[in-house]
C-alpha cells in the first residue's frame, strides 16, 4: 500500500507561531512560517511518503457542531491583539503558498473542521497506510491497523493497540471516543456527565481498560451495578445528568454526534473536495523550487539556514523526493 502523510495544518502552524517567537525579518515575525516548513521538511527527510496532504479549518468551521450543540467552543476567546492576529493570518497564508510550490496537497472548505476532513480521508483511502501529524488527541480516535498518529509535541507515535493518556489516565485508543462522550471536553466547551472524569470513569468501569466498549455496554453495566450506596456519578450516568440538568438519552445522542470522529460531520462539498484530493494528480504548471527559494529570500528564511554551500540543497532535498513522486503520478495519467 502507498504511504500518505496527513498534516493537521492549524495545529502545526499554531505551535510555531506561538512557540517560535524569536525569528523576525525586517521587523516582521516569520517564526510560524519557518517552523511549519522546516518541521515538515525534517519529517519528510526521515520518512518516505508518496503523498502529503495538509488540512486546514475552513471559515465558520464550527457551524455544523454549533447547530447541534450551540455551546460548542463557546469558551474560545480571541487572545491576540490586532497586530498579532494580522501577522497570524499573513503567515498562515504564506505557508499555503510555500506548500503549493513543493507539491503538497491542501484541503480547506468553509463550514468544515480539519479533523472531520482528515477523518473522512482516512475513511475513503482504504488502500493507503496513513500517518496523521498532529498533537490533537481527538484524532487518536482514528487509529487503526493502517492509521498511525505522530505527535510533534510529544515526538511520539501512537499506533494500533496503544493507550492514550487523557488527563493522566491511560485509555486504550479504541475507547477514546466513548470516554470523551461520557466525560465531555472542556477545551471545546462540551459538557460531560456531572461528577465524572476519566479517573472515575475507569474506576467505575475497569473493563474499559481491557476491551473495546460501547455506550450501551457501559449503561447496561451501570444498571446492573446500581445500588443505594452507589456513587452519585453512577446515577448521573443513567439519567444523563450534566451541569445543565438531566438530559437522558439526548445527552448521549448529542455528544456522540459532536465527538465521534469515526462518523465525521462534513458537508457534501467537503466530501467532494477530499475525494478529489485523494484521487486527482497535481498540476505542475508554475510550481517549482525557484519560486520556493524566492519566497524564502523574501521572508529572510535563508538567514536561519546553516552557513555552508550545501544549505539550500539540504533544505530542499526532502521536498524534491515528494515532487518527483507527484510528477511521476501526473505523467502516468
Regions found by a protein language model. Give the residues of each.
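Non-catalytic, usually N-terminal nucleic-acid engagement modules in DNA/RNA processing proteins
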Residues: 1-71
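Extended two-metal-dependent nuclease catalytic cores across DNA- and RNA-processing enzymes
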Residues: 2, 22, 77-283, 290, ...
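Short glycine-rich phosphate-binding loop at a beta-alpha junction
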Residues: 6, 50-58, 106-108, 129-133, ...
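Generic intrinsically disordered, low-complexity segments enriched for polar/acidic and small residues
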Residues: 33, 66-69, 85, 147, ...
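Short, low-complexity, polybasic intrinsically disordered segments
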Residues: 69-75, 79
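Long, highly charged low-complexity segments enriched in Glu/Asp and Lys/Arg with interspersed Ser/Thr
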Residues: 286-333
